[in-house]
Amino acid sequence: MSMQDPIADMLTRIRNGQFASKISVIMPSSKLKVKISILLKEEGYIKDFSVNSTNKPILEIFLKYFRSKPVIENITRVSSPSLRIYARNNKLPQVMSGLGIVIISTSQGVLTDQVARKKGLGGEIICNVS
């Protein structure tokens, strides 16, 4: 049985791992998941991640906590395979008045909402993180 939405699965694994106070979560890897992980690390939402390529590539994300509480309070999928959500550069949403991030897939790669605004790019809204 194939997975219908691998990005939603990734976000759910991160959310469930943090609720269970896990050190890390493991999932199948893809280029898009690695790019999302890079953004989450740059923005300080996760400690680190690694990709292990034995037979099938596996992505391991090391979760981050502050005073024994998860750094990620909320992580939700916006665009799904059945309902794609796009936004122009002047209509990009903000999470918690700019305290959170929106991850967007643009023509120049996967970017946060702040970087996409500076570059004047719109695209598919992948998820919100706060």
From Swiss-Prot:
SUPFAM superfamilies: Ribosomal protein S8 (SSF56047). Keywords: Ribonucleoprotein, Ribosomal protein, RNA-binding, rRNA-binding. PROSITE patterns: RIBOSOMAL_S8. One of its GO terms (molecular function) is rRNA binding. InterPro entries: Ribosomal_uS8, Ribosomal_uS8_CS, Ribosomal_uS8_sf. GO terms for biological process: translation. One of its GO terms (cellular component) is ribosome. Belongs to the universal ribosomal protein uS8 family. One of the primary rRNA binding proteins, it binds directly to 16S rRNA central domain where it helps coordinate assembly of the platform of the 30S subunit. PANTHER family: 40S RIBOSOMAL PROTEIN S15A. Part of the 30S ribosomal subunit. Contacts proteins S5 and S12. This is Small ribosomal subunit protein uS8.
